[in-house]
Amino acid sequence: MKKKTLSILSLCIALFAALALVGCGGSASSGGGGSSASKSEGKEKAPVAKKTDFIWFKVEMPKSVGVSDSAGKNADRVQLTFPEDENGSADRFIPVWKKALTTEESHADQAEKKGDTFQWEDGGSVEYNGRTWLVGTYEDNSGVSTLLFTDVEPGSVYVLISNFDLHKKEAEALLNSIEFPDDMAKAVAEAREVEISSIEIKH
């Protein structure tokens, strides 16, 4: 009788354990599956950053920004353009490399050239994506132009932006993504041999 009771008790324990395992497994499978699915559905893939490679600089191009070869057909003379105004004129984003000038020297050089004639104003410094730029502005018949100066190796680069405030979103997107090579002299020499028309523009 005692053995029979123990046998029944053992059977009950085994049955209870089996049910518990099935219950836990079902719950974990259901909950885990649901959680995984919801995470998978809720998490969208971040868009891959696409930079257009102009050889001596790379930059992410907003859809509204275009490319101009009006200053020259090769990549070392490339200019970026903002949307045209009602007169068909487009403001520009123009990078310029100064091999022999530091950032401070280039800034001082432009301040001297523009001077009182164009109401030059020193704008201090700003930072975009960890890079520091010295700023200056001047005014002419086309509006207010902003110049931003930064260090490269060798020398410095300044970017001229026409009517910055009118194109702030696009201009800051460009400044936040622009990058320069370690050897500007080598990159610019290579860019002089590449036509702008052969470069893949990525938006």
Regions found by a protein language model. Give the residues of each.
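Bacterial N-terminal signal peptides that target proteins for export
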Residues: M1-C12
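C-terminal motif of bacterial Sec signal peptides marking the signal peptidase cleavage site
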Residues: L19-G23
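Bacterial signal peptide processing site
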Residues: G25-A28
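N-terminal "mature-domain start" segment
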Residues: G34-A75, E200-H203
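Short, hydrophobic/aromatic-rich segments at coil-to-beta transitions
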Residues: E44-K50, N74-Q79, E127-T137
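Secretory pathway targeting signatures of secreted, lumenal, and periplasmic proteins
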Residues: F54-S106, N141
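Surface-exposed amphipathic alpha-helical segments
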Residues: K63-V65, S156, L160-H203
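Signature of long, low-cysteine stretches enriched in small and polar/charged residues
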Residues: A111-G155, I196-K202
